Amino acid sequence: MKKDAPVFNFNCFRWSLYCDYISKIENNKIMRRLFVSLMLTLTAFIANAQPSAIAPHDYQQMLKKGIDVDWWGRSEKNKYGAYSETAVKRFAQQGIKHVRFRLHHYHFTDEDFKRLFSQINTCMQNNLIPIIAFSAKPYKENPNAEEHEKVVEWWKIMAERCKDLSPKVSFDLIVEPSDKVKKDVAELNSLYEDCVATIRKTNPKRIIFIAPPKLSHPEGLKNLKIPSMGNGYLMAEWHFYAAGPSKSNDKKRWTSGTAKEKQLIKKSIKVAVDWQKETAIYTWVGAWMPGDYNKGDNYSVKEQIEFASFMTQQLDKYGIPFAINSDDKFYDYQAEQWIPQYKDLLNTIFILMDE
């Protein structure tokens, strides 16, 4: 008996093609959704990602010109100095690129950290780089083992609380080694060794500044022993004329800007620049003052502009960033504006020299 020939069912074939087509469309939709979702996630990550570290050379260039601020008072007796978000915005508008927080208090509460982080966030939102500096006055006055450990513990706690902050936030271990510790080089270097080792446990690549003995003068840089855990993310802070020039003190004399007076400034900068080249440790000037505001205010604004103009030119010449000392000398926090008489002075330092 002859077998029947197979019958081709066109309708079944058409239905099969249709189902296959629909399946591919659905798969494409799913893939499209996954792709869009992945791109959105990646875009958000790129937009919000922070670099894991900033090299000292790059950080030095980022700092440019800044100002020391007393938002946390001037001693352990008072944690509250003049501060406002409006002031931060005014600073940024003036061309200021970084601020140094000078902290004096050994006991930081959760509320204190909340306030500190709020100030840091406001700075970051306005493109101001925050530098956290510790005064450690009791240690400087009496640098014994007990005070040594208190400073190390302070930085341990600060580092733990700041470990997730942007790498733009840096640590300045001691504001001007003065009093007894200014001559105790071995103790100061020992403190730096211990503080850096402690900080590195939670902040392996955050920029840390160490300051030389002898009131942070550049001549003291040669006495610094670089901490073993510096690991390439260590810088040095030095300064001169932190309380302004003087018309009588030969060490920081400035009258009319004579060749001899200018040479004093050039000599100090050269000492720091030579040390920087020799050690490959980049530096920053943490404080200089255009006038002797704390010691009689003996300079006219015109004289201050002449001094500030030369200082700025010389530091700019070698790419050394700096902070002027200090905020409330130039900014009126009650009126929320720069003190009018210093407008040209500030422009000389922060704007005109950058143009």
Feature map (PLM): residue ranges:
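Positively charged n-region of N-terminal signal peptides that target proteins for export
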Residues: 2-3, 28-34
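Bacterial N-terminal signal peptides
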Residues: 37-44
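N-terminal carbohydrate-binding accessory modules
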Residues: 50-98
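Acidic/histidine-rich helix-loop elements
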Residues: 67-83, 103-107, 144-146, 245-264, ...
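Aromatic-lined substrate-binding rim segments of carbohydrate-active enzymes
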Residues: 85-138, 149-153, 157, 191, ...
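Active-site region of glycoside hydrolase catalytic domains
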Residues: 152, 156-291, 310, 317-323
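Aromatic-rich peripheral "rim/lid" segments of glycoside hydrolase catalytic domains that contact
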Residues: 296-355
